[in-house]
Amino acid sequence: MITILGAGGGIGSELAKLLIDRKQPFRLVSRSPGAVPGATETVSADITDQGQTIRAVAGSRIVHLLVGLKYDHRLWAEMWPRVMANAIEACKRAQARLVFFDNVYMYGKVNGPMVEETPFSPCSKKGEIRASIANAS
C-alpha cells in the first residue's frame, strides 16, 4: 500500500492522479479527506497526533509526506518537528519507506546548480527550522 499523508494539497492530488493512472492501490490521509474516484482508501487523521499517524500508516510499504502548514515560522517551529517525528515513528512501525517532499528554504541563497551535496545555509527562520529538521532526521 502506498500512503499519501497530506493528500488535500496540490502535490498530493497530482500524485493521486499518477497512482490512479498506474492502477496502484493507495490510501489518502488528511484531516478531512474527500472522496477521490480511484482511491483505494481514504483515512481521516491529524498527523500532529502520533497515534492517529501510526494508525493511518499501518500496512503501508511507501509513505509520501506531503503535508503543508500555514506559512508562519512560529507554527513551523512548533508543528514540523512533531509532524516529522510522527511520520518517522509510524514508518518505522510499519516498516515503510518514507518519501518527504521538502522545500529549499534550508539552502538559503545558492549561486549555481543545487545538488544533493549542497550545504544548508538558511537565511530565514523557516530555513533554520527546515535545516534543523533535516539534520535531526
How would you label these PLM feature ranges?
Residues 2-3, 73-75, 120-124:
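Short, contiguous strand/loop micro-motifs
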Residues 5, 29, 66-67, 100-103:
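SDR active-site strand-loop-helix element
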Residues 24-31:
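Conserved glycine-rich Rossmann-like NAD(P)H-binding loop of the short-chain dehydrogenase/reductase
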Residues 17-21, 89, 135:
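Short, well-ordered alpha-helices that flank and scaffold nucleotide-derived cofactor binding pockets
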Residues 2-24:
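N-terminal Rossmann NAD(P)H-binding glycine-rich loop of SDR-like oxidoreductase domains
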Residues 34-94, 107:
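NAD(P)H-binding glycine-rich loop region in Rossmannoid oxidoreductase-like domains
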Residues 25, 85-132:
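Conserved Rossmann-fold NAD(P)-dependent oxidoreductase catalytic core, especially the SDR/UDP-sugar
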Residues 15, 30, 133-136:
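Hydrophobic alpha-helical segments typical of transmembrane helices
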